[in-house]
Amino acid sequence: MNAAEIKALLQAHGLTPNRALGQNFLVDEAAAAAIAEASGAAEFPVLEIGPGLGALTEELLRRSSQVVAVEIDAAMVSILKERFPSAKNLLLQHEDFLDTDLGALAPLLGTQCAVAANLPYYVTTPICMKLLTSELPIARMALMLQKEAAERFTTLPGSRQYGPLTVLAQRYYEVKTLMTLPPARYYPQPDVDSVVLTLCRRPGVPVLPALPRILAAAFSMRRKTLLNNLRSTGLSKESAEALLEQCAISPAARAEALPPEAFARLAAQWEKISI
């Protein structure tokens, strides 16, 4: 969909973009096609988050055997039903993705699936954390994010953006920048550039159930040492010291200085400890 089509569609339904929901609709048809292709839609069933007016949905439906689209805005759901009335490979879910039971969607998404999303800035972190800690068999993701949010995925240890999201993304996925989209590629135009990231699951990397808990503790007080912060997991000071020593990590280290593999060692070792 181009800008003229999107404006006409909104006008026909007496709608304006909902700023409270961070609605900025993609108006670049070539970009929508490239994002759909990069998401892995041709290979896997797709979970789409925030389909909006369906610019990306249209491209996903052309490629994927199954698209499960979760949309919070009832007006958008109605328009999507009008636009794709005979799409047998589309399942629309009218709800807040943060409230969605991903376990209930799993049977629809098969043994491997893809994710495609145009994420508003204000919910980027909770949505991405939900994806990165879910049990869905996600093989690939294509995410449209504001530039500042995208930097959290690609940043290095030592930066202020480095945090739990960074570690989880880089531990389990190969993260690449697909393209940068200037404000003119959206309606209405946002204030900053957007970035499309692709995340490809790293083969053979085991899931560490304790990793989210370790990260939450480690980054809970960024100015405190790991020794101090890890005690919030229930470890005594002596046990926390022993854990860090076993993982060859200084007790004086701070979370923002550790690479993802160090947190993986911590989580794997922590799981062996009886608290």
Each model region followed by its residue ranges:
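Active-site-proximal catalytic alpha-helix in oxidoreductases
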Residues: 220-223
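Short helix-coil junctions and helix-kink-helix linkers
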Residues: 231-233
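Catalytic cores of RNA-modifying enzymes
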Residues: 1-217, 245, 256, 265-268, ...
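Short helix/strand-capping connector loops at secondary-structure junctions
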Residues: 242-251
